[in-house]
Amino acid sequence: TLFHYSSIVYFVIYLLNADSIKKWQWIGVIFICYALAITGLYITPIIGYIGWEPVNSLFIHYYSDSIIEENVNIFNIVHLGQVFCALFMLFIVDKIKYVSPFLIVALKIFVIGLCIKTVFSDLPVVANRSSELFTSIEVFLIPTALYGFFKKQLLYVTINILYSLIFFTYSLITWF
Protein backbone atom coordinates (compact mmCIF):
# COMPACT_ATOMS: atom_id res chain seq x y z
CA THR A 1 0.00 0.00 0.00
CA LEU A 2 1.03 3.61 -0.42
CA PHE A 3 0.19 4.69 3.12
CA HIS A 4 -0.14 3.37 6.62
CA TYR A 5 -3.67 2.85 7.92
CA SER A 6 -3.05 5.11 10.88
CA SER A 7 -2.64 8.06 8.53
CA ILE A 8 -6.41 8.03 8.03
CA VAL A 9 -6.77 9.91 11.31
CA TYR A 10 -5.04 12.87 9.68
CA PHE A 11 -8.07 13.28 7.42
CA VAL A 12 -9.86 14.92 10.34
CA ILE A 13 -7.41 17.84 10.19
CA TYR A 14 -8.43 18.58 6.60
CA LEU A 15 -12.03 19.07 7.72
CA LEU A 16 -11.23 21.65 10.41
CA ASN A 17 -12.10 25.30 9.86
CA ALA A 18 -9.04 27.45 10.56
CA ASP A 19 -10.90 30.77 10.52
CA SER A 20 -13.33 30.48 13.41
CA ILE A 21 -13.99 28.42 16.50
CA LYS A 22 -17.17 27.81 18.47
CA LYS A 23 -15.49 27.66 21.85
CA TRP A 24 -18.52 26.43 23.80
CA GLN A 25 -18.96 23.58 21.34
CA TRP A 26 -15.33 22.48 21.84
CA ILE A 27 -15.57 22.89 25.62
CA GLY A 28 -18.71 20.74 25.52
CA VAL A 29 -16.89 18.07 23.51
CA ILE A 30 -14.22 17.81 26.22
CA PHE A 31 -16.82 17.44 28.97
CA ILE A 32 -18.88 14.93 26.96
CA CYS A 33 -15.79 12.78 26.36
CA TYR A 34 -14.99 12.79 30.07
CA ALA A 35 -18.61 12.00 30.92
CA LEU A 36 -18.54 9.02 28.54
CA ALA A 37 -15.27 7.75 30.02
CA ILE A 38 -16.43 8.17 33.62
CA THR A 39 -19.66 6.28 32.96
CA GLY A 40 -17.77 3.53 31.13
CA LEU A 41 -19.41 4.15 27.76
CA TYR A 42 -16.62 3.77 25.23
CA ILE A 43 -16.85 3.90 21.45
CA THR A 44 -14.34 1.07 21.12
CA PRO A 45 -17.00 -1.67 20.61
CA ILE A 46 -18.47 0.31 17.71
CA ILE A 47 -15.19 0.06 15.80
CA GLY A 48 -15.64 -3.71 15.65
CA TYR A 49 -18.63 -3.19 13.36
CA ILE A 50 -16.62 -1.41 10.67
CA GLY A 51 -16.74 -3.64 7.61
CA TRP A 52 -13.15 -3.03 6.51
CA GLU A 53 -11.03 -6.10 7.21
CA PRO A 54 -7.66 -4.37 7.92
CA VAL A 55 -9.32 -2.15 10.53
CA ASN A 56 -11.17 -5.09 12.10
CA SER A 57 -8.02 -7.22 12.36
CA LEU A 58 -6.04 -4.36 13.91
CA PHE A 59 -8.89 -3.67 16.30
CA ILE A 60 -9.07 -7.32 17.39
CA HIS A 61 -5.29 -7.38 17.89
CA TYR A 62 -5.25 -4.15 19.93
CA TYR A 63 -8.31 -5.15 21.92
CA SER A 64 -6.84 -8.55 22.83
CA ASP A 65 -3.65 -6.78 23.98
CA SER A 66 -5.68 -4.30 26.03
CA ILE A 67 -7.31 -7.09 28.04
CA ILE A 68 -3.88 -7.78 29.54
CA GLU A 69 -3.04 -4.09 30.06
CA GLU A 70 -4.87 -1.61 32.23
CA ASN A 71 -6.94 1.27 30.93
CA VAL A 72 -5.29 4.61 30.32
CA ASN A 73 -5.38 6.86 33.38
CA ILE A 74 -7.20 9.96 32.16
CA PHE A 75 -6.95 11.54 35.59
CA ASN A 76 -3.15 11.73 35.79
CA ILE A 77 -1.51 15.10 36.26
CA VAL A 78 -0.15 15.35 32.72
CA HIS A 79 -3.47 14.72 31.00
CA LEU A 80 -5.43 16.91 33.41
CA GLY A 81 -2.81 19.66 32.94
CA GLN A 82 -3.29 19.44 29.19
CA VAL A 83 -7.07 19.56 29.59
CA PHE A 84 -6.75 22.60 31.86
CA CYS A 85 -4.50 24.33 29.30
CA ALA A 86 -6.95 23.52 26.51
CA LEU A 87 -9.91 24.86 28.50
CA PHE A 88 -7.96 27.99 29.44
CA MET A 89 -7.02 28.60 25.80
CA LEU A 90 -10.61 28.01 24.68
CA PHE A 91 -11.83 30.62 27.17
CA ILE A 92 -9.30 33.22 25.95
CA VAL A 93 -9.25 32.25 22.27
CA ASP A 94 -10.81 35.57 21.20
CA LYS A 95 -7.92 37.42 22.80
CA ILE A 96 -5.09 35.24 21.48
CA LYS A 97 -6.26 34.23 17.99
CA TYR A 98 -4.46 37.17 16.37
CA VAL A 99 -1.00 35.94 17.45
CA SER A 100 -0.81 33.27 14.75
CA PRO A 101 -3.03 32.31 11.82
CA PHE A 102 -2.60 28.66 12.83
CA LEU A 103 -3.66 29.07 16.46
CA ILE A 104 -7.33 28.17 16.01
CA VAL A 105 -6.69 25.01 14.00
CA ALA A 106 -3.85 24.06 16.38
CA LEU A 107 -6.21 24.41 19.34
CA LYS A 108 -8.80 22.23 17.62
CA ILE A 109 -6.17 19.57 16.87
CA PHE A 110 -5.05 19.67 20.50
CA VAL A 111 -8.61 19.20 21.79
CA ILE A 112 -9.16 16.31 19.36
CA GLY A 113 -6.04 14.62 20.72
CA LEU A 114 -7.23 15.02 24.30
CA CYS A 115 -10.67 13.69 23.44
CA ILE A 116 -9.24 10.68 21.59
CA LYS A 117 -7.20 9.73 24.64
CA THR A 118 -10.25 10.07 26.86
CA VAL A 119 -12.72 8.20 24.66
CA PHE A 120 -10.32 5.36 23.79
CA SER A 121 -8.94 5.02 27.32
CA ASP A 122 -10.09 1.40 27.40
CA LEU A 123 -7.80 0.68 24.42
CA PRO A 124 -4.36 1.90 25.58
CA VAL A 125 -2.46 1.43 22.31
CA VAL A 126 -4.92 3.45 20.25
CA ALA A 127 -5.44 6.05 22.98
CA ASN A 128 -1.77 6.79 23.51
CA ARG A 129 -0.64 6.66 19.88
CA SER A 130 -3.49 8.76 18.52
CA SER A 131 -3.34 11.23 21.37
CA GLU A 132 0.41 11.75 20.99
CA LEU A 133 -0.10 12.21 17.27
CA PHE A 134 -2.47 15.12 17.84
CA THR A 135 -1.30 16.61 21.15
CA SER A 136 2.27 17.04 19.96
CA ILE A 137 1.01 20.38 18.61
CA GLU A 138 1.23 21.69 22.20
CA VAL A 139 4.90 22.46 21.50
CA PHE A 140 3.65 25.28 19.25
CA LEU A 141 0.30 25.99 20.86
CA ILE A 142 1.14 26.65 24.51
CA PRO A 143 4.00 29.15 23.98
CA THR A 144 2.01 30.97 21.31
CA ALA A 145 -1.08 31.18 23.52
CA LEU A 146 0.97 32.36 26.50
CA TYR A 147 2.62 35.05 24.41
CA GLY A 148 -0.76 36.19 23.12
CA PHE A 149 -2.22 36.30 26.61
CA PHE A 150 0.60 37.98 28.53
CA LYS A 151 2.30 39.96 25.73
CA LYS A 152 5.48 39.98 27.80
CA GLN A 153 8.23 37.77 26.52
CA LEU A 154 10.00 37.14 29.83
CA LEU A 155 6.79 36.14 31.62
CA TYR A 156 5.63 33.70 28.98
CA VAL A 157 9.09 32.16 28.64
CA THR A 158 9.22 31.66 32.42
CA ILE A 159 5.77 30.05 32.50
CA ASN A 160 6.64 27.83 29.55
CA ILE A 161 9.86 26.68 31.24
CA LEU A 162 7.99 25.94 34.49
CA TYR A 163 5.33 24.00 32.56
CA SER A 164 8.02 21.96 30.83
CA LEU A 165 9.90 21.32 34.07
CA ILE A 166 6.77 20.12 35.87
CA PHE A 167 5.93 17.60 33.16
CA PHE A 168 9.57 16.54 32.74
CA THR A 169 9.89 15.95 36.48
CA TYR A 170 6.62 14.02 36.51
CA SER A 171 7.75 11.83 33.61
CA LEU A 172 11.04 11.11 35.39
CA ILE A 173 9.25 10.18 38.60
CA THR A 174 6.83 7.86 36.82
CA TRP A 175 9.58 6.37 34.66
CA PHE A 176 11.39 4.72 37.58
Question: What is each residue range found by the language model?
Answer:
Residues 12-16, 86-89, 138-149:
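Transmembrane alpha-helical segments
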Residues 14, 18-130, 174:
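Alpha-helical transmembrane segments and terminal signal-anchor/GPI-anchor hydrophobic tails
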